[in-house]
């Protein structure tokens, strides 16, 4: 059995991950972690998320290192916020616990800190801004279209999410922009345009527009537009429920347990893309 720990265990994503892990024949949840000094600490995890008693107590993250050393999970799954995720990965690395990270909003410096901890302690990590299988196929298609069309088409990326999402643009939109830039041999830091306002003038050559919409309960919509003279190609992915991301997490855990042969992998590795 693969022993799984989950951060943000009482939240929307955390609870869905736990319920799905518990439904697998080869996995079990052995730890649930909430924010430091959480009032939920000590509660039975299963009862908290509506599964019934599991015999696993929720812990506050201030006790993470101690509990990891005691419980010894095989992997910790993190869908929280960037700052917390970095500290969690560092602690997991010190304790020899592998990680699957779907947290978004991580900047380059935070990713560098994560990568160093993972490599220095020789653990395995699957890190992706979007774990959904369909989104990663979407990434692959976006890259192929960019490569075929070249620099003659203007590229605009539009993402939409629920009004509670904290970071913008989404990690998925940023990754799509990176893929476009890589395939067009562009420096994204120079060519990215995050929204427009006022008299911005003519669109600069090779600019990559990135736009964020927030409203209601939108789970996640992403559109990459390749706009040419007289025609437009749109590559679209829409997530209707968070289960799409959870299913990807299960794939990542299984891949890490049986096939992963390097310290840091992403969902392209998991899916063989």
Curated annotation (Swiss-Prot):
**Where can this protein be found?**
Cytoplasm
| Domain of life of the native organism | Archaea
Q: Name one GO molecular function term.
A: 4-hydroxy-tetrahydrodipicolinate reductase
Listed binding positions for (S)-2,3,4,5-tetrahydrodipicolinate are: 162, 171-172
E.C. number:
1.17.1.8
Where do the annotations place NAD(+) binding? 8-13, 34, 102-104, 128-131
Copy the pathway line from the protein's UniProt record. Answer: Amino-acid biosynthesis; L-lysine biosynthesis via DAP pathway; (S)-tetrahydrodipicolinate from L-aspartate: step 4/4
**Top-tier EC class:** oxidoreductase
Xref: NCBIfam families: dapB
Q: Which protein family is it in?
A: Belongs to the DapB family.
Name this polypeptide is given: 4-hydroxy-tetrahydrodipicolinate reductase
Which organism encodes this protein? Answer: Methanosphaera stadtmanae (strain ATCC 43021 / DSM 3091 / JCM 11832 / MCB-3)
In the record, what lineage is assigned to the organism producing the protein?
Archaea, Methanobacteriati, Methanobacteriota, Methanomada group, Methanobacteria
Name the gene that codes for it.
dapB
């Amino acid at each position: 059995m693969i022993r799984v720990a989950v951060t943000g265990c009482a939240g929307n994503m955390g609870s869905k991950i736990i319920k799905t892990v518990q439904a697998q024949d080869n996995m079990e949840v052995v730890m649930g972690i909430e924010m430091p000094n959480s009032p939920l600490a000590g509660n039975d995890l299963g009862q908290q998320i509506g599964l019934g008693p599991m015999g696993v107590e929720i812990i506050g993250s201030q006790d993470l290192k101690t509990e990891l050393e005691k419980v010894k999970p095989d992997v910790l799954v993190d869908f929280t916020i960037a700052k917390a995720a970095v500290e969690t990965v560092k602690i997991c690395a010190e304790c020899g616990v592998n990680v699957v990270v779907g947290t978004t909003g991580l900047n380059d410096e935070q990713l560098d800190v994560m990568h160093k901890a993972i490599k220095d302690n020789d653990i395995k990590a699957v890190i992706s801004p979007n774990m959904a299988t369909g989104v990663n196929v979407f990434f692959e298609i976006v890259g192929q279209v960019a490569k075929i069309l070249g620099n003659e088409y203007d590229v605009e990326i539009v993402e939409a999410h629920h009004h509670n999402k904290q970071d913008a643009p989404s990690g998925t939109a940023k990754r799509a922009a990176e893929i476009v830039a890589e395939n067009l041999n562009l420096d994204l830091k120079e060519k990215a345009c995050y929204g427009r306002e006022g008299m911005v003038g003519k669109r600069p050559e090779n600019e990559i527009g990135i736009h964020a919409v927030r409203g209601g309960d939108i789970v996640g919509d992403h559109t990459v537009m390749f706009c040419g003279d007289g025609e437009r190609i749109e590559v679209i992915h829409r997530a209707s429920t968070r289960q799409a991301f959870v299913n990807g997490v299960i794939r990542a855990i299984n891949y890490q347990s049986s096939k992963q042969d390097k310290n840091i992998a992403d969902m392209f590795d998991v899916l063989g893309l």
